Protein backbone atom coordinates (compact mmCIF):
# COMPACT_ATOMS: atom_id res chain seq x y z
CA UNK A 1 0.00 0.00 0.00
CA UNK A 2 1.27 3.48 -0.85
CA UNK A 3 -0.05 6.82 0.43
CA UNK A 4 1.11 10.40 0.79
CA UNK A 5 1.19 10.42 4.60
CA UNK A 6 1.25 7.90 7.41
CA UNK A 7 0.25 9.39 10.77
CA UNK A 8 1.52 7.38 13.74
CA UNK A 9 -0.89 7.91 16.63
CA UNK A 10 -4.65 8.46 16.87
CA UNK A 11 -4.80 10.93 19.74
CA UNK A 12 -5.95 14.51 19.30
CA UNK A 13 -2.73 15.70 17.64
CA UNK A 14 -2.63 12.80 15.20
CA UNK A 15 -6.34 13.19 14.49
CA UNK A 16 -6.04 16.93 13.82
CA UNK A 17 -3.03 16.34 11.58
CA UNK A 18 -4.86 13.65 9.62
CA UNK A 19 -7.95 15.82 9.27
CA UNK A 20 -6.13 18.87 7.92
CA UNK A 21 -3.83 16.79 5.70
CA UNK A 22 -6.89 15.15 4.16
CA UNK A 23 -8.47 18.55 3.60
CA UNK A 24 -5.25 19.59 1.86
CA UNK A 25 -5.71 16.74 -0.61
CA UNK A 26 -3.26 14.19 0.77
CA UNK A 27 -3.92 10.45 0.87
CA UNK A 28 -3.62 9.61 4.56
CA UNK A 29 -3.41 6.47 6.68
CA UNK A 30 -3.48 6.71 10.48
CA UNK A 31 -1.95 3.79 12.38
CA UNK A 32 -2.54 3.35 16.09
CA UNK A 33 -1.29 0.46 18.21
CA UNK A 34 -4.25 0.73 20.59
CA UNK A 35 -7.61 2.47 20.34
CA UNK A 36 -8.51 5.96 19.13
CA UNK A 37 -7.64 8.47 21.88
CA UNK A 38 -6.45 5.57 24.01
CA UNK A 39 -3.40 7.33 25.48
CA UNK A 40 -2.99 10.79 26.95
CA UNK A 41 -6.03 12.09 25.05
CA UNK A 42 -8.26 9.89 27.18
CA UNK A 43 -6.86 11.30 30.42
CA UNK A 44 -6.91 15.06 29.87
CA UNK A 45 -9.30 17.72 31.11
CA UNK A 46 -9.74 19.11 27.59
CA UNK A 47 -8.00 22.42 28.17
CA UNK A 48 -7.81 24.98 25.37
CA UNK A 49 -5.84 27.60 27.26
CA UNK A 50 -3.84 30.77 26.79
CA UNK A 51 -3.85 31.81 30.45
CA UNK A 52 -1.14 29.42 31.63
CA UNK A 53 1.49 30.40 29.06
CA UNK A 54 4.18 33.04 29.27
CA UNK A 55 4.90 35.17 26.20
CA UNK A 56 6.91 33.21 23.65
CA UNK A 57 6.56 30.52 20.97
CA UNK A 58 4.14 28.31 22.92
CA UNK A 59 1.78 31.21 23.58
CA UNK A 60 1.99 32.20 19.92
CA UNK A 61 0.99 28.64 19.00
CA UNK A 62 -1.82 28.67 21.59
CA UNK A 63 -3.27 31.89 20.17
CA UNK A 64 -3.01 30.53 16.64
CA UNK A 65 -4.66 27.30 17.71
CA UNK A 66 -7.47 29.27 19.35
CA UNK A 67 -8.13 30.80 15.94
CA UNK A 68 -8.27 27.38 14.30
CA UNK A 69 -10.68 26.03 16.94
CA UNK A 70 -12.95 29.06 16.63
CA UNK A 71 -12.79 29.54 12.85
CA UNK A 72 -11.67 26.50 10.85
CA UNK A 73 -13.36 24.03 13.22
CA UNK A 74 -16.25 26.21 14.42
CA UNK A 75 -18.95 24.31 12.52
CA UNK A 76 -17.97 21.10 14.30
CA UNK A 77 -17.63 22.51 17.83
CA UNK A 78 -20.83 20.94 19.11
CA UNK A 79 -19.49 17.49 18.22
CA UNK A 80 -16.78 17.76 20.88
CA UNK A 81 -18.63 20.08 23.30
CA UNK A 82 -16.46 23.14 22.70
CA UNK A 83 -17.25 25.51 25.57
CA UNK A 84 -15.79 29.00 25.71
CA UNK A 85 -16.11 29.16 29.48
CA UNK A 86 -13.14 31.39 30.28
CA UNK A 87 -10.45 30.84 32.88
CA UNK A 88 -10.11 32.47 36.29
CA UNK A 89 -6.66 32.47 37.88
CA UNK A 90 -6.69 33.33 41.59
CA UNK A 91 -4.01 34.35 44.06
CA UNK A 92 -3.99 33.94 47.83
CA UNK A 93 -1.72 36.92 48.54
CA UNK A 94 -1.06 40.42 47.28
CA UNK A 95 2.33 39.22 46.10
CA UNK A 96 0.60 36.55 44.03
CA UNK A 97 -1.72 39.15 42.55
CA UNK A 98 1.27 41.31 41.62
CA UNK A 99 2.84 38.34 39.83
CA UNK A 100 -0.38 37.78 37.88
CA UNK A 101 -0.46 41.43 36.86
CA UNK A 102 3.16 41.26 35.67
CA UNK A 103 2.47 38.12 33.64
CA UNK A 104 -0.62 39.73 32.10
CA UNK A 105 1.38 42.71 30.81
CA UNK A 106 3.43 40.47 28.52
CA UNK A 107 0.46 38.28 27.60
CA UNK A 108 -1.56 41.31 26.48
CA UNK A 109 1.28 42.42 24.23
CA UNK A 110 1.14 39.00 22.59
CA UNK A 111 -2.60 39.28 21.96
CA UNK A 112 -4.16 37.64 25.02
CA UNK A 113 -7.33 39.12 26.51
CA UNK A 114 -6.96 39.53 30.29
CA UNK A 115 -9.18 41.25 32.83
CA UNK A 116 -7.77 42.15 36.22
CA UNK A 117 -10.08 40.91 38.98
CA UNK A 118 -10.07 42.47 42.44
CA UNK A 119 -10.81 40.68 45.69
CA UNK A 120 -14.32 42.15 45.81
CA UNK A 121 -15.03 41.09 42.21
CA UNK A 122 -14.11 37.42 42.64
CA UNK A 123 -17.60 36.37 43.87
CA UNK A 124 -19.10 37.84 40.68
CA UNK A 125 -17.15 35.24 38.73
CA UNK A 126 -17.33 32.34 41.19
CA UNK A 127 -19.79 32.71 44.11
CA UNK A 128 -18.41 29.66 45.95
CA UNK A 129 -14.76 30.74 46.05
CA UNK A 130 -13.00 31.00 49.41
CA UNK A 131 -13.43 34.58 50.70
CA UNK A 132 -9.82 35.10 51.78
CA UNK A 133 -8.37 35.12 48.24
CA UNK A 134 -6.61 38.37 47.32
CA UNK A 135 -7.59 38.74 43.65
CA UNK A 136 -7.10 37.22 40.25
CA UNK A 137 -7.21 37.51 36.48
CA UNK A 138 -9.91 36.41 34.05
CA UNK A 139 -9.08 35.03 30.60
CA UNK A 140 -12.19 34.97 28.36
CA UNK A 141 -10.37 33.07 25.59
CA UNK A 142 -9.86 29.95 27.70
CA UNK A 143 -12.10 27.09 26.61
CA UNK A 144 -12.73 23.40 27.09
CA UNK A 145 -13.43 20.42 24.82
CA UNK A 146 -13.99 16.71 25.34
CA UNK A 147 -10.72 15.33 23.93
CA UNK A 148 -11.89 11.80 23.16
CA UNK A 149 -14.73 13.27 21.12
CA UNK A 150 -12.28 15.56 19.33
CA UNK A 151 -10.12 12.64 18.23
CA UNK A 152 -13.06 10.44 17.28
CA UNK A 153 -14.88 13.06 15.22
CA UNK A 154 -11.80 14.51 13.51
CA UNK A 155 -10.87 11.01 12.39
CA UNK A 156 -14.44 10.35 11.27
CA UNK A 157 -14.31 13.55 9.21
CA UNK A 158 -10.91 12.56 7.82
CA UNK A 159 -12.30 9.14 6.82
CA UNK A 160 -15.17 10.88 5.07
CA UNK A 161 -12.51 12.68 3.04
CA UNK A 162 -10.78 9.44 2.09
CA UNK A 163 -8.38 8.78 4.96
CA UNK A 164 -7.95 5.33 6.47
CA UNK A 165 -7.62 4.61 10.18
CA UNK A 166 -6.04 1.36 11.34
CA UNK A 167 -6.24 0.66 15.06
CA UNK A 168 -4.50 -2.25 16.82
CA UNK A 169 -1.67 -1.70 14.35
CA UNK A 170 1.76 -1.16 15.85
CA UNK A 171 4.68 0.49 14.08
CA UNK A 172 7.69 -1.82 14.38
CA UNK A 173 10.16 -0.03 12.12
CA UNK A 174 10.69 2.25 9.16
CA UNK A 175 11.14 1.67 5.46
CA UNK A 176 14.07 3.54 3.91
CA UNK A 177 15.68 4.38 0.62
CA UNK A 178 19.16 5.40 1.69
CA UNK A 179 18.77 7.96 4.48
CA UNK A 180 15.22 8.80 3.49
CA UNK A 181 12.20 7.43 5.36
CA UNK A 182 9.79 5.99 2.81
CA UNK A 183 7.19 4.36 5.02
CA UNK A 184 6.59 2.19 8.06
CA UNK A 185 6.71 -1.46 8.98
CA UNK A 186 3.70 -2.42 11.08
CA UNK A 187 2.28 -5.48 12.77
CA UNK A 188 -0.18 -5.63 9.86
CA UNK A 189 2.31 -5.13 7.03
CA UNK A 190 4.34 -2.42 5.34
CA UNK A 191 2.96 0.94 4.20
CA UNK A 192 4.99 3.12 1.85
CA UNK A 193 4.49 6.86 2.07
CA UNK A 194 5.84 10.18 0.95
CA UNK A 195 6.02 11.23 4.60
CA UNK A 196 5.59 9.70 8.04
CA UNK A 197 4.32 11.87 10.91
CA UNK A 198 5.28 10.86 14.44
CA UNK A 199 2.25 11.90 16.52
CA UNK A 200 2.64 9.18 19.13
CA UNK A 201 2.28 11.44 22.15
CA UNK A 202 4.13 10.27 25.24
CA UNK A 203 5.52 7.36 23.23
CA UNK A 204 6.89 9.57 20.44
CA UNK A 205 10.45 9.23 21.71
CA UNK A 206 10.28 5.50 21.09
CA UNK A 207 9.01 6.01 17.54
CA UNK A 208 11.85 8.47 16.93
CA UNK A 209 14.32 5.89 18.25
CA UNK A 210 13.07 3.40 15.66
CA UNK A 211 14.01 5.94 13.02
CA UNK A 212 17.44 6.49 14.57
CA UNK A 213 16.84 10.06 15.76
CA UNK A 214 16.67 11.50 19.27
CA UNK A 215 13.51 13.31 20.37
CA UNK A 216 13.47 13.51 24.19
CA UNK A 217 9.76 13.12 24.95
CA UNK A 218 9.32 11.83 28.50
CA UNK A 219 6.20 10.83 30.47
CA UNK A 220 5.04 13.24 33.19
CA UNK A 221 2.33 11.63 35.29
CA UNK A 222 -0.76 13.48 36.46
CA UNK A 223 -3.94 12.64 38.38
CA UNK A 224 -7.48 13.97 38.11
CA UNK A 225 -10.29 13.59 40.63
CA UNK A 226 -13.91 13.49 39.47
CA UNK A 227 -16.74 14.45 41.82
CA UNK A 228 -20.38 13.50 41.95
CA UNK A 229 -22.57 15.65 39.67
CA UNK A 230 -23.45 19.08 41.06
CA UNK A 231 -26.14 21.56 39.96
CA UNK A 232 -25.41 23.37 36.71
CA UNK A 233 -22.92 26.25 36.92
CA UNK A 234 -21.91 25.52 40.50
CA UNK A 235 -18.42 26.22 39.19
CA UNK A 236 -18.69 28.47 36.17
CA UNK A 237 -15.17 28.67 34.77
CA UNK A 238 -11.88 26.87 34.76
CA UNK A 239 -10.40 28.05 38.07
CA UNK A 240 -6.83 27.55 39.14
CA UNK A 241 -4.31 28.92 41.57
CA UNK A 242 -1.59 31.27 40.38
CA UNK A 243 1.19 28.80 41.17
CA UNK A 244 -0.12 26.48 38.44
CA UNK A 245 1.65 28.62 35.82
CA UNK A 246 4.98 28.02 37.54
CA UNK A 247 4.34 24.29 37.86
CA UNK A 248 3.60 24.04 34.14
CA UNK A 249 6.92 25.69 33.31
CA UNK A 250 8.94 23.75 35.88
CA UNK A 251 11.42 21.03 34.95
CA UNK A 252 11.38 19.45 38.42
CA UNK A 253 10.89 15.69 38.38
CA UNK A 254 9.42 15.62 41.90
CA UNK A 255 5.71 15.75 42.68
CA UNK A 256 4.12 19.17 42.16
CA UNK A 257 0.49 19.96 42.83
CA UNK A 258 -1.52 23.12 42.23
CA UNK A 259 -5.32 23.26 42.34
CA UNK A 260 -7.26 23.34 39.08
CA UNK A 261 -11.04 23.06 39.39
CA UNK A 262 -13.69 23.11 36.68
CA UNK A 263 -17.18 21.86 36.02
CA UNK A 264 -18.34 19.80 33.06
CA UNK A 265 -21.51 19.76 31.00
CA UNK A 266 -22.59 16.65 32.90
CA UNK A 267 -22.30 18.37 36.29
CA UNK A 268 -19.22 16.58 37.57
CA UNK A 269 -16.25 18.63 38.73
CA UNK A 270 -12.72 17.83 37.57
CA UNK A 271 -9.92 18.47 40.06
CA UNK A 272 -6.22 18.57 39.13
CA UNK A 273 -3.38 19.10 38.63
CA UNK A 274 -0.34 17.09 39.62
CA UNK A 275 2.95 16.62 37.80
CA UNK A 276 5.78 14.17 38.44
CA UNK A 277 8.28 12.27 36.33
CA UNK A 278 8.08 8.64 37.42
CA UNK A 279 8.32 6.92 34.06
CA UNK A 280 5.21 4.98 33.07
CA UNK A 281 4.35 4.02 36.65
CA UNK A 282 0.55 3.59 36.68
CA UNK A 283 0.21 3.11 40.43
CA UNK A 284 -2.11 5.44 42.34
CA UNK A 285 -0.40 8.02 44.53
CA UNK A 286 -2.47 8.61 47.66
CA UNK A 287 -0.23 11.57 48.47
CA UNK A 288 -0.93 13.27 45.14
CA UNK A 289 -4.66 12.64 45.28
CA UNK A 290 -4.98 13.77 48.89
CA UNK A 291 -3.04 16.94 48.20
CA UNK A 292 -5.19 17.76 45.18
CA UNK A 293 -8.37 17.30 47.20
CA UNK A 294 -7.11 19.48 50.05
CA UNK A 295 -6.02 22.28 47.74
CA UNK A 296 -9.30 22.18 45.83
CA UNK A 297 -11.21 22.52 49.11
CA UNK A 298 -9.01 25.50 50.00
CA UNK A 299 -10.25 27.21 46.82
CA UNK A 300 -13.86 26.03 47.08
CA UNK A 301 -14.76 25.16 50.70
CA UNK A 302 -18.14 23.75 49.59
CA UNK A 303 -16.27 20.83 47.98
CA UNK A 304 -15.61 19.46 51.47
CA UNK A 305 -19.15 18.03 51.42
CA UNK A 306 -18.90 16.64 47.88
CA UNK A 307 -18.00 13.01 47.13
CA UNK A 308 -15.22 12.10 44.73
CA UNK A 309 -16.54 9.23 42.61
CA UNK A 310 -13.36 8.27 40.78
CA UNK A 311 -9.81 9.22 39.93
CA UNK A 312 -7.70 8.57 36.87
CA UNK A 313 -4.19 9.22 35.67
CA UNK A 314 -2.37 9.94 32.45
CA UNK A 315 1.07 10.76 31.14
CA UNK A 316 1.84 14.12 29.59
CA UNK A 317 4.43 14.08 26.76
CA UNK A 318 7.07 16.31 28.34
CA UNK A 319 9.99 17.93 26.49
CA UNK A 320 12.88 19.42 28.51
CA UNK A 321 12.48 22.91 27.04
CA UNK A 322 8.67 22.86 27.39
CA UNK A 323 8.09 23.33 23.67
CA UNK A 324 6.48 20.79 21.35
CA UNK A 325 8.29 19.18 18.44
CA UNK A 326 6.64 20.15 15.15
CA UNK A 327 7.89 19.80 11.60
CA UNK A 328 10.21 17.82 9.32
CA UNK A 329 13.26 16.10 10.74
CA UNK A 330 16.38 16.93 8.68
CA UNK A 331 18.21 13.99 10.26
CA UNK A 332 15.80 11.55 8.60
CA UNK A 333 14.23 13.09 5.49
CA UNK A 334 10.63 11.98 5.11
CA UNK A 335 10.09 11.80 8.89
CA UNK A 336 7.99 14.52 10.51
CA UNK A 337 7.02 15.09 14.13
CA UNK A 338 4.01 16.53 15.96
CA UNK A 339 4.55 15.62 19.60
CA UNK A 340 5.87 16.77 22.97
CA UNK A 341 3.05 19.20 23.79
CA UNK A 342 3.02 18.09 27.45
CA UNK A 343 -0.18 19.26 29.18
CA UNK A 344 -1.18 21.63 26.36
CA UNK A 345 -1.68 19.10 23.59
CA UNK A 346 -5.47 19.25 23.52
CA UNK A 347 -5.51 23.00 23.03
CA UNK A 348 -2.53 23.09 20.66
CA UNK A 349 -3.68 20.15 18.53
CA UNK A 350 -5.81 22.17 16.12
CA UNK A 351 -3.05 24.64 15.31
CA UNK A 352 -0.44 21.91 15.12
CA UNK A 353 -2.49 19.91 12.64
CA UNK A 354 -3.12 22.92 10.43
CA UNK A 355 0.57 23.93 10.42
CA UNK A 356 1.70 20.39 9.63
CA UNK A 357 -0.69 20.19 6.68
CA UNK A 358 0.55 23.50 5.30
CA UNK A 359 4.18 22.43 5.52
CA UNK A 360 3.52 19.00 4.03
CA UNK A 361 2.04 20.47 0.84
CA UNK A 362 4.75 23.11 0.55
CA UNK A 363 2.70 26.12 1.61
CA UNK A 364 4.15 28.87 3.79
CA UNK A 365 3.09 28.11 7.36
CA UNK A 366 0.97 30.61 9.26
CA UNK A 367 3.46 30.41 12.15
CA UNK A 368 7.24 30.04 12.12
CA UNK A 369 8.09 26.45 13.07
CA UNK A 370 11.75 27.17 13.86
CA UNK A 371 11.28 27.18 17.69
CA UNK A 372 9.74 23.70 17.45
CA UNK A 373 12.44 22.16 15.23
CA UNK A 374 12.98 18.42 15.88
CA UNK A 375 16.78 18.68 15.68
CA UNK A 376 17.13 21.40 18.34
CA UNK A 377 18.08 18.88 21.03
CA UNK A 378 21.61 17.57 21.67
CA UNK A 379 22.28 13.92 20.75
CA UNK A 380 21.07 11.40 23.32
CA UNK A 381 24.57 10.72 24.62
CA UNK A 382 25.08 14.46 25.29
CA UNK A 383 21.66 15.23 26.78
CA UNK A 384 21.56 16.09 30.50
CA UNK A 385 20.04 13.42 32.72
Named regions from a protein language model:
Residues 60, 89-99, 138-156, 283-288, ...:
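Short beta-strand to alpha-helix junction loop
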Residues 137-194:
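Helical element adjacent to the flavin cofactor pocket in flavoenzyme catalytic cores
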Residues 147, 281-385:
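C-terminal catalytic lobe of FAD-dependent flavoproteins
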Residues 22-42:
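Glycine-rich FAD pyrophosphate-binding loop
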Residues 19-23, 46-48, 80-83, 180, ...:
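Active-site substrate-recognition segment that forms the wall
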Residues 45-125, 258, 296:
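Dinucleotide-binding Rossmann-like beta1-alpha1 core, especially the glycine-rich loop
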Residues 1-13, 29:
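Beta1/beta-strand and adjacent pyrophosphate-binding region of the FAD-binding site
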Residues 6-8, 191-203, 207, 353:
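Short hydrophobic core segments
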Amino acid sequence: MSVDLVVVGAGVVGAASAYFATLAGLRVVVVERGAIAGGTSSAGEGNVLVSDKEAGPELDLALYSQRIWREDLAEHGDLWEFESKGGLVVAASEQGVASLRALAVHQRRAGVEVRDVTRSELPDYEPHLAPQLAGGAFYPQDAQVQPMLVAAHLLRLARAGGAQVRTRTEVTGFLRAGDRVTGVRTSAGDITAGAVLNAAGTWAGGIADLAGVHVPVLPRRGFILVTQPLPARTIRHKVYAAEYVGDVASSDAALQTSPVVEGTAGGTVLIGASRERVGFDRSISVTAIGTLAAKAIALFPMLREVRAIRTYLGFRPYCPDHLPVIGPDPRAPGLWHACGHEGAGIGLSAGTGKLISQALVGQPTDLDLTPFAPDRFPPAEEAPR
